[in-house]
Amino acid sequence: MDNFQGDLTDVVRGIGSGHVSPSPGPPEGPSPSSMSPPPTSDLHVEFPSAATSASCLANPFGDPFVSMKDPLIHLPASYISGAGDNKSNKSFAIFPKIFEDDHIKSQCSVFPRIKISQSNNIHDASTCNSPAITVSSAAVAASPWGMINVNTTNSPRNCLLVDNNNNTSSCSQVQISSSPRNLGIKRRKSQAKKVVCIPAPAAMNSRSSGEVVPSDLWAWRKYGQKPIKGSPYPRGYYRCSSSKGCSARKQVERSRTDPNMLVITYTSEHNHPWPTQRNALAGSTRSSSSSSLNPSSKSSTAAATTSPSSRVFQNNSSKDEPNNSNLPSSSTHPPFDAAAIKEENVEERQEKMEFDYNDVENTYRPELLQEFQHQPEDFFADLDELEGDSLTMLLSHSSGGGNMENKTTIPDVFSDFFDDDESSRSL
């Protein structure tokens, strides 16, 4: 047909024959070797030329955009790795990998991207220079957060790859070993313990629960008691009272197999020298030998604890009774029983108190004022004493008893009174 006019089939055939060049030859598309760098614009899009539109023949409507793919995907790798220093080329080189990676959703992510990959080998620090990691680090450069790449390996240690977002795109490898948690807890220092088994001494009192601990020349103070499971006897806890900073401890309990044996467990060592006998007996737990001490030591302690007034009374009694044979002498007599010594001390105190009371009555005189000290003793000597009570005298006269003299004297007095009255009337 002339001028390509006719039905629709002729039009389509005319379009295909007019645009297809039958001459063979190399394609006119750009080759990788002779390709010039694209312009610096980020919105650069290359459209296919008329010679490369042979693929559009399958489209019956001749739409050139239907079969067109993304031109950025088919760019060579040399162009991506050889991007310039300017920011526009660098940002343009980021887009292909972002489109190719399915995990990255957007370029400017506010939160860090955590990528977990399983491998059998621990990645070296040299893997940070790979193009994928370089592109990923550059992709999150605009984000204030970094990208953490966690590699779970078969080894017992877990490695964390943290990308430092700097201009050189260098990454540093931080390894955090999953060590056991109990290593940070300090164990208690192993203390030396010494166990001693000795026969249990008999209790001094009648109570069966009384615990008697033998003396070991150290001063101990009981600070606790705990019942033992399966044993009727408790366990006592003691600490050293000789020195304030001593860490020595001991535990006293009866043996489960033989109740007549004491099991003493010493913990730690004393950091001070041996105490004296006085300091050893200063604690609450005294040995049984302390109850049978000689009376001289007890009398000396009793004298040291007496008040000053009792000392004065003792001096007075010693002056009045220098030869007192009832007092026991500490050098000649053997040790007495504690109860007998206590009774003697009580009797001596009572005697001293009675003596002091009598002495006070004899020697005490109240101090009078000076104006009364020079008065004679016969101050009331000039006064006469009444022979009888006047009231009794009047009662005796009214009752009719008594002396006749008194009866006669009383009417005479009244008679004189009445006589004087009659004489005055007559005048």
Swiss-Prot record:
SUPFAM superfamilies: WRKY DNA-binding domain. GO terms for cellular component: nucleus. It is found in: Nucleus. Keywords: DNA-binding, Nucleus, Transcription, Transcription regulation. Transcription factor. Interacts specifically with the W box (5'-(T)TGAC[CT]-3'), a frequently occurring elicitor-responsive cis-acting element. GO terms for molecular function: DNA-binding transcription factor activity; sequence-specific DNA binding. Residues 284-310 have a biased composition (Low complexity). Its main location: nucleus. Residues 209-275 bind DNA. Residues 23-40 have a biased composition (Pro residues). One of its GO terms (biological process) is embryo development ending in seed dormancy. Residues 1-45, 266-336 are annotated as: Disordered. The keyword DNA-binding applies. The keyword DNA-binding applies. This is Probable WRKY transcription factor 35.
